[in-house]
């Protein structure tokens, strides 16, 4: 009997645990380890940040749901991974031995890159976790009591730009509903992207035109090619550069309320494993999600290293979105199962297809990129009220999946396949490893 450990219980790790247990059955043991004892649906955090959703709407305790599927659950943070001995040391000092390890930890938020940008230090908030989103809402309520300048956007090195656009548009929409939009003296969007709608992936469809128009309609002044150097005394210090990376403007923006997506790094326990990660702490994997150094370690989601799609004047990263992450998870599960069944030569690849819904207040933006990284076979970006409704429905659907203990229900698989969207490169399912 082999012991497979999933490290991390987010939108990658929790589906991975369910899918792994379903694939391996009772003949092998599956353990899920998470620093949190609850699951949170991170894509809904922008709503929490303005009070449109509460914590209990998007988060729930993990243990009951995974243990009834025969998955062992440990609510402890991993402090160290000994890849040679195949042991994980937990925060309480206990160790867990594994035969196979799948890393799905998500990121460490690199607030230290920009002095004063930590939500606990000043006016700039984060919505990367539900805890941060709740704090952002508390600060937003303070803004409503005493209006002032708003700055929202993404830091240099950020890779998850969608939520920045979402939150900016949602805040603008909420202010209008409250009759307070005209009380905000300035509303600024600051991004490290070379142009609006780049999204870290050279844009999708007409994302540039649609998002530029959306920000303009809301009266939000946008600046691209920007890096925030520090936040101090309710001021944000920003440097804007040209196409060659040369400084063209230094700005000091007043900020009563802000939200900036930080750059990501790998979590310390993972980043500290010799030869496992790149300098940023992200796991170096091959096209089958397997570590390039350790054959029994796999990784999926934000935890893996994906090079930027292009060199930009201000550093930007490539995002790892929901369906793309599920694609990675499915490939890793297939390959671990093949190993355990003595079929180590058979390798499966994920498609890395991306389907994303972003709420923009009373409207929304959706994109389908097959695959997410260019060159693409499908490249569509759409905008309208239907996307807002679709995201509301998807949140409820995904949370229900996680409570039911199913990674990919058959009807989801059939429906997506009819649309030409699959998790795995089926033609490579039995591809022989070179």
Swiss-Prot record:
UniProt KW keywords: FAD, Flavoprotein, Membrane, Nucleotide-binding, Oxidoreductase, Quinone
Effect of residue 160 to A: Strongly reduces FAD reduction. Abolishes activity with decylubiquinone
Essential cofactor(s): FAD
Localization: Membrane
EC number: 1.8.5.4
Record note on cofactor: Binds 1 FAD per subunit.
Annotated family: Belongs to the SQRD family.
Protein's name in the database: Sulfide-quinone reductase
Natural source organism: Acidithiobacillus ferrooxidans (strain ATCC 23270 / DSM 14882 / CIP 104768 / NCIMB 8455) (Ferrobacillus ferrooxidans (strain ATCC 23270))
């Amino acid at each position: 009997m082999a012991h497979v450990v999933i490290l991390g219980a987010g939108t990658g790790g929790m589906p991975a645990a369910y899918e792994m247990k379903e694939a391996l059955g009772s003949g092998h043991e599956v353990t899920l380890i998470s620093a949190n004892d609850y699951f949170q649906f991170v894509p809904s955090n922008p709503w929490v940040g303005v009070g449109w959703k509460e914590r209990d709407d998007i988060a729930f305790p993990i243990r009951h749901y995974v243990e009834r599927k025969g998955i062992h659950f440990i609510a402890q943070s991993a402090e160290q991974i000994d890849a040679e001995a195949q042991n994980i040391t937990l925060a309480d000092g206990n160790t867990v031995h594994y035969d196979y390890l799948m890393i799905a930890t998500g990121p460490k938020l690199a607030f230290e890159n920009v002095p004063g940008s930590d939500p606990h230090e000043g006016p700039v908030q984060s919505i990367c976790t539900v805890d941060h989103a709740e704090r952002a809402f508390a600060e937003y309520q303070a803004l409503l009591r005493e209006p002032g300048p708003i700055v929202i956007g993404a830091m240099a090195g950020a890779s998850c730009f969608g939520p920045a656009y979402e939150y900016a548009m949602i805040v603008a929409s909420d202010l209008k509903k409250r009759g307070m939009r005209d009380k905000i003296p300035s509303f600024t969007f600051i991004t490290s992207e070379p142009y609006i709608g780049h999204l870290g992936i050279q844009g999708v469809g007409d994302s540039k035109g649609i998002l530029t128009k959306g920000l303009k309609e809301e009266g939000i002044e946008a600046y691209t090619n920007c890096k925030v150097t520090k936040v101090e005394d309710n001021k944000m210090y920003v440097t804007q550069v040209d196409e060659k990376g040369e400084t063209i403007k230094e700005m000091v923006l007043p900020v009563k309320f802000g939200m900036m997506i930080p750059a990501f790094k790998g979590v310390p326990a993972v980043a500290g494993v010799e030869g496992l990660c790149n300098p940023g702490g992200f796991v170096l994997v091959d096209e089958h999600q397997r570590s390039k150094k350790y054959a029994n370690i796999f990784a999926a989601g934000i935890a893996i290293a994906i090079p930027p799609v292009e060199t930009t004047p201000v550093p930007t990263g490539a995002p790892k979105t929901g369906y793309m992450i599920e694609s990675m998870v499915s490939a890793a599960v297939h390959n671990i199962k093949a190993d355990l069944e003595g079929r180590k030569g058979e390798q499966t690849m994920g498609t890395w297809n991306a389907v994303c819904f972003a709420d923009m207040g009373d409207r929304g933006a959706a994109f389908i990129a097959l695959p997410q990284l260019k060159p693409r076979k499908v490249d569509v970006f759409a905008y309208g009220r239907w996307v807002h409704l679709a995201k509301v429905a998807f949140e409820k659907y995904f949370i229900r999946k996680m409570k039911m203990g199913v990674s990919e229900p058959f009807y989801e698989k059939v429906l997506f396949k009819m649309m030409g969207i699959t998790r795995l490169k089926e033609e490579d399912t039995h591809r022989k490893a070179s």
